[in-house]
Amino acid sequence: MRVRWTADAADDLEQISDYIAEDRPGTARRIAMDIIRSVDALDAFPNQGRQGRVEGTRELVLTPLPFIAVYEVHDDEVQILRLLHGAQEWPTS
């Protein structure tokens, strides 16, 4: 199964990385790679995340990081919708 990042999710990752890089550039690169590796594992185990707060979605908690990947599982792909901080206000749809 293919993992595809939406533009919103890719923007979320870039914003997270840019924010961390302001103080710790090396850490920002490592965290971005950790997030990408964790999300890419959904290709083999697309239902490993919990039921999402928004109907039809699933959520992969990126432990030990404070981020959650929100995604949908389709017939032949996992679509990453957003990458949100656990304390962030969630969209309703």
Model region roles, listed by residue range:
Residues 57, 66-68:
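Short hydrophobic/aromatic beta-strand or adjacent loop that forms the aromatic wall/cage
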Residues 2-57, 74-77, 93:
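Basic, Lys/Arg-enriched alpha-helical interface segments
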Residues 68, 72-93:
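Enriched for short, Lys/Arg-rich terminal
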Residues 62-64:
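Conserved strand-loop elements at the edges of beta-sheets that form or border functional pockets
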